Amino acid sequence: MTQTLSQLENSGAFIERHIGPDAAQQQEMLNAVGAQSLNALTGQIVPKDIQLATPPQVGAPATEYAALAELKAIASRNKRFTSYIGMGYTAVQLPPVILRNMLENPGWYTAYTPYQPEVSQGRLEALLNFQQVTLDLTGLDMASASLLDEATAAAEAMAMAKRVSKLKNANRFFVASDVHPQTLDVVRTRAETFGFEVIVDDAQKVLDHQDVFGVLLQQVGTTGEIHDYTALISELKSRKIVVSVAADIMALVLLTAPGKQGADIVFGSAQRFGVPMGYGGPHAAFFAAKDEYKRSMPGRIIGVSKDAAGNTALRMAMQTREQHIRREKANSNICTSQVLLANIASLYAVYHGPVGLKRIANRIHRLTDILAAGLQQKGLKLRHAHYFDTLCVEVADKAGVLARAEAAEINLRSDILNAVGITLDETTTRENVMQLFSVLLGDNHGLDIDTLDKDVAHDSRSIQPAMLRDDEILTHPVFNRYHSETEMMRYMHSLERKDLALNQAMIPLGSCTMKLNAAAEMIPITWSEFAELHPFCPPEQAEGYQQMIAQLADWLVKLTGYDAVCMQPNSGAQGEYAGLLAIRHYHESRNEGHRDICLIPASAHGTNPASAHMAGMQVVVVACDKNGNIDLADLRAKAEQAGDNLSCIMVTYPSTHGVYEETIREVCEVVHQFGGQVYLDGANMNAQVGITSPGFIGADVSHLNLHKTFCIPHGGGGPGMGPIGVKAHLAPFVPGHSVVQIEGMLTRQGAVSAAPFGSASILPISWMYIRMMGAEGLKKASQVAILNANYIASRLQDAFPVLYTGRDGRVAHECILDIRPLKEETGISELDIAKRLIDYGFHAPTMSFPVAGTLMVEPTESESKVELDRFIDAMLAIRAEIDQVKAGVWPLEDNPLVNAPHIQSELVAEWAHPYSREVAVFPAGVADKYWPTVKRLDDVYGDRNLFCSCVPISEYQ
């Protein structure tokens, strides 16, 4: 049969690439669940009153090649000037071996946060290396495995300083006047909700101020001056004031460690260690503190523990500090951080080692000395005598200098009164320095690099002798071994092989949406047009970014039913915080600032109450009924009780129990009736796109997890993006920025992220996804996600009861399997099942959330029926194994479940178990076997014997 050209062109080809089950598989699954079609299934499950009559108009789908060409044309509108702006962002040289083997490798970027350490030892080791780099450079005792960015880390440092302060009545936080402006911006935003007063003054005047609980200093000021704060820190410590220091990671290679000078907390951006600027992110922040404060630290911390065989193994330590356990009492609302970026930085340090890093840092400093000498020789004055890589140059004809810079396609820092700022980096060359001489002095300057190099003293005094590092760094063997590309490639591959990512198997984590991160979506993030822009470059140089962001925002507006989208939050947790701040400021604008009660269902993710607390709200829990739905009577009672103090409700939809609640519109109406706003958590947006929308349901604000629904990969625990969609009345209250005016946003609010558009360089991933799927594909993706979840639920419900269902016994895009009856009957727990799944080659589902003793499964639309059946077969086989325990064939204390996972060495070890080696290690057959490298971890040992730095190589032997 002849096909038309339009049919043969097949613009929707990517839809079939993204969605796992083909048409025949979809029909088989529809038959299995008793539905005639995807539309019929959706019609049964989603409440009629919230179903969209027509899908959002986001255009027709495009092929991978057409979408890439279209985005390339947009990217080409960005102008790549050489940037010397600095302010915490510099150009880098990402080693190609790391680019190819990590950043472009799905074995690294598709993994999940390492909650299951047995399948995460590779990236845990890389993160432990990151912590070791942080410890060596900061001179402190305890380091975290990354925070979202430097400015966020500063806000976390302030919050932590208050938590550990012995000055309980003090309520003021002092910030030195030469911190980066974006850092001050985010600190002020956070301080407002905590009720802290922020004082900004010259650091030497800090002692003039009373009732100060904490101080933030910057070792190398924003205009380049190196400060020796040793005496000041000593005086502050004598007054029991907690001292935080912002530091430059490359400068720390040469400068004395702030921890050695007495600082309590040290943080900064690790961007300079190989991570492109990317118009603001994503980048990992480093964060370190004294050992005595470890239980008050924010973010993930990797610790050394033992496995069941007594072997050294790594895990996330001290999780009881975190939001998923402590909820509103958590140290921070941080969930995902920046694991992929932290690992790039850690491997940059491994590849270069201490010798290589010192060479890079010394070369940057040498070029800065040469530039300084030439400028001074020609009569220009430097504002600071002590510097590392940044000069603040006083110029008489500033306009002329900036005009010459623009003509030469150079960006200088221009916001300093009567001066310009110049920050050099590892990409700076001799030719660049000569070009800078021409810009600042004119073409006839007569200077010569070689002559200046000879003239400049080799014992340069531009770094104070007292500020030069006198201790060794990175002495651990891991930083002194892998310096050839062959060794580095093999080391990275050895780490990758230890982990389980989407390139090996389905990751059925409920509430996490581990869907395909297509290669075509990932390709643009490494394009130089996107990767090399400074976030504070003039807007006319970022027209491509602005067009791409505006187009993506327009699509998200249509998909969410909101009126505006703010792209600044660079994680879901930060999106929650930004959305709640918008609600808070909206109430204040109406003289209703007293509204501070946030209603949160008992089933909510721990980030919700933690974010509400950070936004200065009181959390009141709303009960759920026996079916897992919000108890409307209790909601009405709590709303009535809150009265004029009701600020909002935070609700997830579909619910965290995996069902479309029939009364969601009524929930919104009750809250609105009492003057509150509705925050609809976008964590489960993958079951809404094209079918319904938060705005249509009646919500006022949501964050969107672009790293879930819109295909940004999880990266082993970050990056993420959490933009917020808002109704028009909240649009004036979304985050703004003190350095860059965000076009189209009338907001005057403070920032929540260091960069105006958060992690802008990963936004092309979501742009590509929406462009290639189109309206038709996006709706179908949601429908197939629902089909896949219902297929699993229907196949497993006789073996593992599905805890919550909606109408007709259906679930949404995920289902909760109740393990509690089996545990009572047999003693086998959800943990045992999770670990046994590793032997079958699967990452575990989400354990004990939102209900203890359960497993929550979310297959996503990207998994084929073949993979779903493989998972189902594994679960049914595990159920048969549990029956063997129940029947007494295997004792409860010695069976394949409680001993799981099994490792390769057990094949040749002594064997005294009542089951065979084959049952232990090959339960699903020998084909394509995944081997964990450690047995089940001893969590208690790890927290009782906390050790969070690199261990001797002998420990792994």
UniProtKB/Swiss-Prot annotation:
EC number of the protein: 1.4.4.2
Keyword Oxidoreductase: yes
Pfam families, A to Z: GcvP2_C, GDC-P
Protein origin, superkingdom: Bacteria
Record Gene3D superfamilies: Aspartate Aminotransferase, domain 1, Type I PLP-dependent aspartate aminotransferase-like (Major domain)
Modified sites of kind N6-(pyridoxal phosphate)lysine: 708
Annotated function: The glycine cleavage system catalyzes the degradation of glycine. The P protein binds the alpha-amino group of glycine through its pyridoxal phosphate cofactor; CO(2) is released and the remaining methylamine moiety is then transferred to the lipoamide cofactor of the H protein.
Name of the protein: Glycine dehydrogenase (decarboxylating)
UniProt organism field: Escherichia coli O17:K52:H18 (strain UMN026 / ExPEC)
